[in-house]
Curated annotation (Swiss-Prot):
Official protein name in the record: Epithelial membrane protein 2
Tissue/organ expression: Expressed in the arches, orbits, pectoral fins, vessels, pronephric renal tubules, and glomeruli.
Listed GO CC annotations: apical plasma membrane; cytoplasm; Golgi apparatus; Golgi membrane; membrane raft; nucleus; perinuclear region of cytoplasm; plasma membrane
Listed PANTHER family: EPITHELIAL MEMBRANE PROTEIN 2 (PTHR10671:SF32), EPITHELIAL MEMBRANE PROTEIN-RELATED (PTHR10671)
Subcellular location: Golgi apparatus membrane; Cell membrane; Apical cell membrane; Membrane raft
Membrane-traversing stretches: 1-21, 67-87, 95-115, 137-157
Domain of life: Eukaryota
Gene transcribed to yield this protein: emp2
Protein family membership: Belongs to the PMP-22/EMP/MP20 family.
Length: 161
């Protein structure tokens, strides 16, 4: 039981770390010395605000920002709820509330990464016209199945002695 518990905690913490990296880091799109994340366009010397990022034209970018932040927050809240339920649940009960929170986090990651995949090319400046997806984008997509599997594990898991 302790091995399963340690594995689930490690899996959850790894998911949270991946979500933090994907949300904060500036490598969603890369082209040479330029990189773009959800917040800034950067070159080798400085970072600049994304043009028109606060306008209606950038609604997709704001949706990606919101869903990735929400996914990260839900993943962290889910971990604290799991720890709380670990001490409060009766023997034999399932971690349903934690599972729901973690599955919502997975849904938010999937939504944010999907929107960025579909709309990422429509808003980037000329310097990102032929850019490649960066590692933060890949990390976001890796975080999706990890949070999904974590949520499903919580759904199946029962509290034992």
């Amino acid at each position: 039981m302790l091995v399963i518990l340690a594995f689930i905690i490690l899996f959850h913490i790894t998911s949270a770390i991946l979500l933090f990296i994907a949300t904060i880091n500036n490598a969603w799109r890369i082209k040479g010395d330029f990189s773009m994340d959800l917040w800034y366009n950067c070159n080798t010397t400085a970072c600049y605000d994304i043009p028109k990022s606060a306008t209606y034209d950038a609604a997709y970018l704001q949706a990606v920002q919101a869903t990735m932040i929400l996914a990260t927050i839900l993943c962290c809240v889910g971990f604290f709820v799991f720890i709380l339920q670990l001490f409060r649940l009766k023997q034999g009960e399932r971690f349903v509330f934690t599972a729901i929170i973690q599955l919502l986090s997975a849904f938010c990651v999937m939504t944010g990464a999907s929107i960025y995949t579909a709309e990422g090319l429509t808003f980037n400046g000329q310097e990102f016209k032929n850019a490649e997806y960066g590692y933060s984008f890949v990390v976001a997509w890796v975080a999706f199945p990890m949070t999904l599997l974590s949520g499903l594990m919580y759904l199946v898991l029962r509290k034992r002695k």
